[in-house]
Amino acid sequence: MEAELIRLGLLNTDEVKKQSQDQPLYKKYFPHGTSHYLGLDVHDYGDKYRKFEPGMVLTCEPGIYIRDEAIGVRIENDILVTEGRPVDLTANIPREAEEIEELMNK
């Protein structure tokens, strides 16, 4: 996360080297976690150290929020744990701005 924010020019290497470990600088642009369980509730709670079992669904949701420009985006994938490879339940959902705009104009 930090490397990408540096690449985008939102953070610089010197700032990152001097940052507090208790309050990492990336939190300004990414204030939430990267995942949660999905089940009976949208944000199901579970032990984060629990072993994944077939049938569980969890999210992978990176995001970026640039308050100074009043923009933000978070893309969520919902992942089903199976006996074999995990299945991305949201694999066929539009992700690119053009795809979303096209869908909205139908």
Predicted regions, residues:
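Active-site cores enriched in adjacent His and Asp/Glu residues with nearby glycine-rich loops
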Residues: M1-S35
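Charged, cofactor-coupling segments
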Residues: T34-K106
